[in-house]
Regions:
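Loop-centered beta-sheet repeat module
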Residues: 9-10, 18-64
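Well-ordered alpha-helical scaffold segments within catalytic/enzyme domains
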Residues: 3-17, 60-76, 119-133, 190-200
Length: 200
């Protein structure tokens, strides 16, 4: 819900050709209709019922990005906004007291994961600043997320506690035991997105 949709969105941004934006919106709504769970989150795979942090982070970032460009009267905007708001409401519930989200979002025993936390912060901050979300609720949550994620940047400007690349597996322990990486680009990019949303 990010890797394909962002290509269409960037093609639209580069060319101004609306067909790319329409394709992006159609792809996103198709994914939402098929994959979003009742709690607003997304399984790592249809046959793997775990809400892996960075997997959901891509979805959150993808929806926030397209909503920035999609006109108010676009036929798919309401559907995407509904999916986005449902996801953001769920993420509010699962944010830890430390401001972070867990490597498995709905498992308190999972470790705080920085790349997904930065992605969620980006998506939530974008919504609060654009008036899509209640700023009095989501603004403080996004700010808390940013402060928390910034605390995971080490003295060499590397983000710590980034989950290693993770394929699907229907095994809880497999996810809970994923390695924590320092300096992975999945984390760097997400932090820059969050910073851009804060400054935008």
């Amino acid at each position: 819900m990010y890797m394909l949709t962002i290509l269409q969105l960037e093609a639209y941004r580069a060319t101004g050709d609306k067909k790319y934006l329409d394709r992006d919106a159609l792809e996103m709504t198709s994914y939402l209709d098929k994959l979003q769970q009742p709690n607003g989150l997304f399984y790592h795979a249809p046959d793997v019922p775990f809400f892996w942090g960075r997997g959901d982070g891509w979805v959150a970032a993808g929806m926030a990005e397209i909503l920035r460009d999609l006109p108010a009267d676009h036929p798919q905007r309401m559907r995407i906004m509904k999916g986005y708001k449902t996801m953001m409401a769920s993420l509010l519930k699962y944010q830890g007291k430390d401001g972070m989200w867990r490597e498995l979002i709905d498992h308190e025993e999972a470790w705080p994961e920085s790349s997904s936390s930065a992605m969620f912060t980006f998506a939530m901050m974008t919504g609060a600043k654009n008036g899509w979300l209640d700023a009095s609720t989501n603004g403080p949550s996004a700010r808390k997320g940013w402060i928390a994620v910034a605390g995971y940047i080490d003295q060499n400007s590397n983000l710590t506690s980034v989950c290693e690349g993770t394929g699907k597996k229907n095994d809880l322990e497999y996810y809970l035991e994923r390695k924590r990486i320092t300096g992975d680009f999945h984390g760097h990019a997400a932090v820059l997105w969050a910073a851009s949303a804060l400054l935008r």
